Design a protein with these regions (language model features):
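Conserved alpha-helix/loop element of class I SAM-dependent methyltransferases that forms part
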Residues: 57-62, 80-108
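N-terminal auxiliary segments of SAM/dcSAM-dependent transferases
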Residues: 1-76, 91
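Local beta-strand N-terminus motif with an aromatic residue
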Residues: 106, 177-178, 246
Length: 263
């Protein structure tokens, strides 16, 4: 397996996917496996069910999760890239901890937009033992995340954000203190832009548009006014009111070009 040098050095997935090991832990994955032109085992990454089964197998194999699933049409984020964010957060926290990466439940993390998959709390809890609170505006996402917690016996706090204009207000209590907040903001600035983005992906794949084929995601996951630049700008502004309650505020933007308007 080729080493993925773009991934963090501590990322378990730098050497790719060990499909033989994954199938042992999650036999359902085998039905979606195929071979690429080089004869290597893989899946069809344009098949939403295949990607969902791969995520389940990865979480079961590498992160000691016994149960994981998400509702149909909800975002199924790729595990390697998401856990990379967790590892870089650990490096960031080390800068405030004498260059030592902090482990254990004394470290409090707030996941803004935790989603139906709960991927950041699941991976961050396993890799570093941090204590997570997950927040989302979508009730189905909260229900799904809570179901994952219950089936795995996990004590991850979940909160519903009821006001689309607020990011921290209403979910960060007066007594709450966090070492870090994390967020993967909606990328698109409108529903039309999100739909065009999905269609463009399919055109690039030579698939053409299909109502049945999509890359997943609900409205709140895919778009918000101003897109990721607008969302991150609001987060920066609103974070000022909680500066005494959090050490680091962070956000993962998808495009390097988004950084300049935010600087």
């Amino acid at each position: 397996m080729a080493v993925k040098l773009m991934l963090h050095p501590r990322n378990q997935h730098r050497e790719g996917y060990d499909f033989e090991r994954l199938v042992v832990k999650s036999p359902e994955l085998e039905a979606f496996m195929t071979r690429n032109p080089r004869g290597q085992m893989t899946i069809n990454f344009q098949d939403a069910d295949a990607v969902r089964m791969l995520n389940r197998a990865l979480l079961m194999t590498h992160y000691e999760i016994d149960f994981w699933d998400i509702p149909a049409s909800y975002l199924c984020p790729p595990i390697p890239g998401r856990v990379d964010y967790i590892h870089y957060l650990a490096d960031l926290l080390a800068k405030s901890n004498g260059q030592e990466i902090p482990h254990g439940s004394d470290i409090k993390a707030l996941d803004i937009g935790t989603g139906a998959s709960l991927v950041y709390p699941l991976t961050g809890r396993h890799e570093y033992g941090w204590d997570f609170t997950g927040v989302d505006i979508d009730p189905v996402s909260i229900k799904s995340a809570r179901h994952i917690c219950e089936r795995n016996g996990l004590n991850i706090r979940l909160k519903r954000q009821n006001n689309a204009e607020d990011i921290f207000e209403g979910v960060v209590g007066s007594d709450d203190v966090f070492h870090v907040t994390l967020c993967n903001p909606p990328f698109h600035a409108s529903l039309a832009q999100a739909q065009e983005g999905t269609q463009r992906k399919w055109r690039n794949l030579g698939k053409g548009h299909s109502a049945e084929l999509n890359f997943g995601g609900q409205n709140a996951e895919l778009w918000c006014p101003g897109g990721e630049i607008g969302f991150t700008a609001r987060m920066i502004e609103q974070s000022k009111n909680f500066s005494e309650q959090c050490l680091w505020f962070t956000c993962l933007v998808s495009k390097k070009d988004s950084l300049k308007p935010l600087s």
